[in-house]
Amino acid sequence: MKHTLLILILLVCYASVSAQLTLKSEKGDFEARLIGRVLFDGGVFFSDKTSLGNAVEVYDVRLGTVVRFLERWTGKIEMGFAKSKVSMKDIYIEYSDGKSLLRVGHCFEPFSLEYRIGTSDMKFNGAAVTGIAFGDRRKLGISYTYDCDVLNVSGGVFSDKDIDNTEKGDEGYALSGRVLFRPYSREKNVIHVGVSSRFGVQGEAEENKITYSAGAPSNLIPEKFLKAEVTEAINEWKFGAEVVMVLDKWYFQSEYLMAHVNRKAAVENYNGDGWYAQVGYALLNGRYGYNRMSGMASTPGAKSLEILCRYNITNMNDKDAGIMGGKQNDFSIGGIYYFNKYVAAKMSYSLVSLDKHAHEGGKQTFSMIQGRVQLSF
């Protein structure tokens, strides 16, 4: 608790000077800016079987800096302090000429969409469960992105081991790629359809086992209701398909993800999948934007109110492989008000339904009301 309070004090001090503390060289070829965020979460849970306690917490704290130099170069160093633990987030250097971007460091692979969105930009308190289950954490590697009017292509090579994993033995590797096509693009209005894929080979420390897990659409619940432990793994394929539409005050995002594990001949291969769809409408002064290089929608801006809805199905059951990790359906509605470019407040309601193979109590239905106040700069 003492560590958390100290971090919050530092963050407040950080925020109070961040507007002025942008360092620039006299020639204008170097600029350094402080960045950070803090998320205050709270939730009330209603369950018929699992004892889910109401909770409040400081979910995420970030501190870092972004450095721009020599016109086209950028560096970023960001550390996380969630739950009083220090972790490495984005730590990379990149070169961009407007159409091409080369990035080296600790960052997300060019695969999937939802799980790569920053916590302060997520539409609900938690990412879509499908994204959590089959997305990937940041890894150490190199990636390249090319962007033009109708096309965005990314590819990368990464280590398959988390940077904080100290286990000995040869590391695995991952190859990933993402392709976006924009059939419609006029000013800030964009429609894109995309596909992505990832191939991974695990290192010696994993002992030929891959585990997929996810909980409810909330960061306040530690329980993993979905969990599939895939043994005798040889390698892993992941596939994704996505649609993003940004049309003035309307926003739509949908994604399908599938994980396929090739296993040794004595057992059947494993397949798990899921999809979600979410829609938003910006009230008051807001309208959505779109980042062409990342292929992500941006928030509607200060003094705006977002009304949101999401439906998600995640299935980790595979009878042929003999692995029943559970299936979850969840429905969420919510809203976000942006007081200014630094402070926002979120509120949402979620209804979750689990099948008989789910962990932590089997078949059940429960609901939750969650809120968040966030500061980011």
Language-model-detected regions and their locations in the chain:
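Outer-membrane beta-barrel pore domains
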Residues: 49-50, 95, 208-377
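Bacterial Sec-dependent N-terminal signal peptides
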Residues: 1-22
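Single-residue recognition of alpha-helix boundary sites
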Residues: 13-14, 116, 160, 259, ...
